[in-house]
């Protein structure tokens, strides 16, 4: 399944900017790897887009943002695979969208 999401906020700067779009792909048979950017359905924070910082012994994901405005890994907690919606496939910078208009 493909997901299209608009970036809201600055927690993934400088990689992803507020207003950018990403397309993510859900993986069924393969796992996600450290440093991949994923979309997660978090029980407390809703849908969040973060980078996998660590995979623990229980195969749960610990996330971090690229920017200083991000929640800490400890605040987000360990994320099980069934909460992952998908991994970044394409990044569409908002500056390109303004050129197209």
Question: What are the roles of these predicted feature ranges?
Answer:
Residues 1-101:
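Extended hydrophobic leader/signal-anchor segments used for secretion and membrane insertion
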């Amino acid at each position: 399944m493909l997901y299209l999401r608009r970036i809201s906020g600055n927690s993934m700067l400088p990689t992803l900017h507020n207003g950018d779009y990403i397309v993510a792909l859900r993986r069924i048979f393969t796992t996600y790897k450290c440093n991949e950017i994923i979309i997660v359905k978090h029980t407390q924070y809703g849908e969040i887009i973060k980078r996998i910082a660590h995979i623990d012994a229980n195969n749960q994901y610990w996330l971090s943002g690229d920017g200083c405005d991000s929640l800490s890994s400890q605040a987000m907690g360990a994320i099980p695979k069934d909460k992952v919606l998908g991994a970044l496939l394409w990044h569409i910078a908002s500056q390109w969208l303004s050129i197209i208009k």
